[in-house]
Regions:
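Chalcogenol-based redox active-site neighborhoods
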Residues: 1-177
Length: 177
């Protein structure tokens, strides 16, 4: 059994190169946002909690954009399911990436679940990350289930604080405890 390993702030994050709904690709670091890429890993179109979360992300995406933050929602869904999610949340400013391999999800420290009922056989659980233009982790949060994610409005407030106070990434100490 492989246990997820958390990513460390101020260290490089794993590579991402994924197709986007609409035909382009999201390649982390190829065209970095001015301040952060906000990566929201979600469970898939089968998840109503994910839909609600992405609706809120889309609603606040213009505010993130004003602050130099690009919003990308990522799942292991295949193309058809990703298009359905994009339609459900009326994705405009939020890019919807898909075909995340489970090995890549694990590299990002995400938890994996076995499907039940109409869910995919296996899929990633949620995670939210802010990645700096240099490819290092600024903030990360992972969940074992769809509930209790960081509210999108709180993330926006955190971005504001980070910008105005020039606040460094925290949680970076990996020495002896």
């Amino acid at each position: 059994m492989t246990t997820p390993t958390p990513l460390m702030p101020r260290e490089r994050v794993p590579a991402l190169d994924l197709p986007l709904v609409g035909g382009d690709r999201y390649v982390l670091g190829a065209k970095p946002a001015q301040r952060f890429d906000l990566l929201v890993f979600y469970r898939g179109v089968h998840c109503p909690v994910c839909t609600k979360y992405l609706l809120e992300l889309e609603r606040l995406a213009p505010e993130f954009e004003k602050r130099g933050v690009r919003s990308v929602a990522i799942s292991s869904d295949e193309s058809e399911r990703a298009v359905k999610m994009a339609e459900k949340v009326k994705a405009n400013l939020v890019s919807i990436a898909f075909d995340l391999q489970l090995s890549a999800a694990r590299a990002w420290g995400l938890y994996l679940s076995a499907g039940r009922g109409e869910e995919p056989a296996y899929f990633n659980e949620p995670g939210v990350f802010l990645v700096k233009p240099d490819g290092t982790l600024y903030y990360g949060s992972t969940q074992t289930m769809p509930f209790a994610r960081p509210p999108i409005a709180d993330l926006l407030g955190a971005v504001d604080y980070a910008i105005t106070k020039d606040y460094p990434a925290r949680g970076e100490y990996a020495g002896e405890a």
